[in-house]
């Protein structure tokens, strides 16, 4: 079977359908290097998302609280375009952008119903990274 010829035509992806969703969930994953904010409906289908890198920060600036704030504002704005009004927040990870992201979701105009910490706790699982000696 001969290989397929490549063309320069771009595929047009799925059209963004404006959903009308009043409440959903906001998942904030804050690591030491980045912060990712995903806003879903109550079934778990992603409506909007943003990360520190997606907003325009590179390198070590992605891990700052300000970058997390910008990512949360961006995701909240996109979700509010779909009619989102109220979210339940689930926070995961040890990063520095946790509280800032929650505050900026509220400042963007989303009503926060509840805040849950869903950081996974090991029952002595993987060995952690070695301590830094600076």
UniProtKB/Swiss-Prot annotation:
Keyword rRNA-binding: yes
An annotated GO BP: translation
Keyword annotations from UniProtKB, A to Z: Ribonucleoprotein, Ribosomal protein, RNA-binding, rRNA-binding
Gene3D superfamilies associated with the record: Ribosomal protein S11
GO MF annotations in UniProt: rRNA binding; structural constituent of ribosome
Name by which UniProt lists this protein: Small ribosomal subunit protein uS11
Subunit comment: Part of the 30S ribosomal subunit. Interacts with proteins S7 and S18. Binds to IF-3.
InterPro entries in the record: Ribosomal_uS11, Ribosomal_uS11_bac-type, Ribosomal_uS11_CS, Ribosomal_uS11_sf
Cellular component terms per the entry's GO annotation: ribonucleoprotein complex; ribosome
Similarity comment: Belongs to the universal ribosomal protein uS11 family.
UniProt gene name: rpsK
Taxonomic classification: Bacteria, Bacillati, Actinomycetota, Actinomycetes, Mycobacteriales
Pfam families listed in its UniProt record: Ribosomal_S11
Function as written in the Swiss-Prot or TrEMBL entry: Located on the platform of the 30S subunit, it bridges several disparate RNA helices of the 16S rRNA. Forms part of the Shine-Dalgarno cleft in the 70S ribosome.
